[in-house]
Structures are given as structure tokens and as C-alpha cells.
């Protein structure tokens, strides 16, 4: 399989998805999210609050250069990022276990829209004010003894589900 160069990646058509990290504290998780975002040609990653930003050797260790290929922005607060996205017409989902959330397997996307998905802090999840601002909430059903997944694992699962729907809806690779 032929891989894109970083320059080719920047010019390539992107998955119309922005990944938002809400106070994610682990540099490993930030790097892993960049790596998954690169794999599926995500439009951008928004890093908010205490979330670390590149360049950083610990991010690079897991991102393997994904922090160079995927566009990213920093926002002091996640509410600022969400407000800007919504102003641009982006539909924002918080990834959180809340009453009335949509199970990921029931997600049905309009492939003519842009979306954002907000992933929260490893301990506290997505801030409540961000959940309240979001246009919807998604959750990954879980059937074991634990009630959460690692944030980078969750991001990979959600990004793949969004990518699958766009691939199926367009009969192309974005």
C-alpha cells in the first residue's frame, strides 16, 4: 500500500471530521489520537485546556509524525472550540455516557455535513458545559465490568465508525 507524504496528506481530501480533546492529560493519548487521525485523514484535531500541544517528544513517540500531517489548533477552553465549530455549521457530538445518548452502532450520519467529536479527560470525561453545548452525545456500549475505555481507544473506534459511514456514503475514500 502506497503511503502519502506529509505534503500529499495536506493536499488530500479529508474526512470531514474534527477531533476535539477536552483536557486530555496523557501525552501518550494525545499522540495516539494524532496517529489515528492521520490513519483516517481527519480534517483537524483541536487541543483544548490542559491538553498538551506539539512539538513534544512524548506526543511524537506515539503519534509517529501524525502531529505533523494532521492540522491542529489549540483553544484555551473546549467551549470556545465548540462555539467556533457550531458557528461554522459543524455538528458537534460529545462522546460521553449520558441519559439519552446515541449508541455508536445506531449512528447515522449525513455525508454532506461536517462533524466534530469531543473526547474528555481520562478521569472526569467531557466537561458538563461541553456536553450541554453539544448537538448530541454518542456512547460506545460496553458489556464488561468496566464502565469506560481509554480515551485514545475510544477515539480510534469513533473515528473508524465515522470513516466507515463516509466511505459507504460516497463510494470513494472521502
Locations of regions flagged by a protein language model:
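Post-transcriptional modification and biogenesis factors for structured RNAs
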Residues: 1-174
Amino acid at each position: 500500500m502506497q503511503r502519502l507524504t506529509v505534503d500529499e496528506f495536506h493536499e488530500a481530501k479529508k474526512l470531514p471530521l474534527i477531533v476535539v480533546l477536552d483536557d486530555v492529560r496523557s501525552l501518550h493519548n494525545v499522540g495516539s489520537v494524532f496517529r489515528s487521525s492521520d490513519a483516517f485523514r481527519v480534517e483537524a484535531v483541536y487541543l483544548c485546556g490542559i491538553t498538551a500541544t506539539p512539538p513534544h517528544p512524548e506526543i511524537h513517540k506515539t503519534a509517529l509524525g501524525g502531529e505533523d500531517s494532521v492540522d491542529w489548533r489549540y483553544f484555551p477552553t473546549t467551549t470556545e472550540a465548540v462555539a467556533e465549530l457550531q458557528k461554522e455549521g459543524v455538528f458537534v457530538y460529545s462522546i460521553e455516557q449520558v441519559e439519552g445518548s446515541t449508541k455508536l452502532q445506531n449512528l447515522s450520519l449525513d455525508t454532506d455535513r461536517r462533524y466534530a467529536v469531543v473526547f474528555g479527560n481520562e478521569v472526569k470525561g467531557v466537561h458538563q458545559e461541553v456536553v450541554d453545548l453539544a448537538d448530541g452525545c454518542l456512547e460506545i456500549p460496553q458489556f464488561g465490568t468496566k464502565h469506560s475505555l481509554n480515551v485514545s481507544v475510544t477515539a480510534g473506534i469513533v473515528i473508524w465508525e465515522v470513516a466507515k459511514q463516509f466511505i459507504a456514503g460516497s463510494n470513494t475514500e472521502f
